[in-house]
Curated annotation (Swiss-Prot):
This is Large ribosomal subunit protein bL9. InterPro entries: Ribosomal_bL9, Ribosomal_bL9/RNase_H1_N, Ribosomal_bL9_bac/chp, Ribosomal_bL9_C, Ribosomal_bL9_C_sf, Ribosomal_bL9_N, Ribosomal_bL9_N_sf. Keywords: Ribonucleoprotein, Ribosomal protein, RNA-binding, rRNA-binding. It comes from Staphylococcus aureus (strain bovine RF122 / ET3-1). PANTHER family: 50S RIBOSOMAL PROTEIN L9. One of its GO terms (cellular component) is ribonucleoprotein complex. Pfam families: Ribosomal_L9_C (PF03948), Ribosomal_L9_N (PF01281). The gene is rplI.
Amino acid sequence: MKVIFTQDVKGKGKKGEVKEVPVGYANNFLLKKNYAVEATPGNLKQLELQKKRAKQERQQEIEDAKALKETLSNIEVEVSAKTGEGGKLFGSVSTKQIAEALKTQHDIKIDKRKMDLPNGIHSLGYTNVPVKLDKEVEGTIRVHTVEQ
């Protein structure tokens, strides 16, 4: 019997997959527990529509990420920090501070965990901070660190 998996079933199939399984297994386990539906022409057509919609949504996410990358390349974020002698910072500028400054100055919300800045910024001046906007799209934020 051909079934369409509605959930991942370990060792048997993943969600959205169409597979041939024994009739007893399908009727007594998969269909009964709503892990799968029978692969009728109507259900197959519905599956194709869902896959097409998911692909369009994914494409839209990529387009949005590319637009955000373009926006980020044209702006600069200014972050102020306390400094000591010789322009050395007390502590460092973190991704949290950069995300907050980006939100207040340009009304752009980016999760601090998407910024690749493992040790923070330890000096005054300009720094380019890489940002993972999507699995396929990566941009940079230009951060200007100034004295407080």
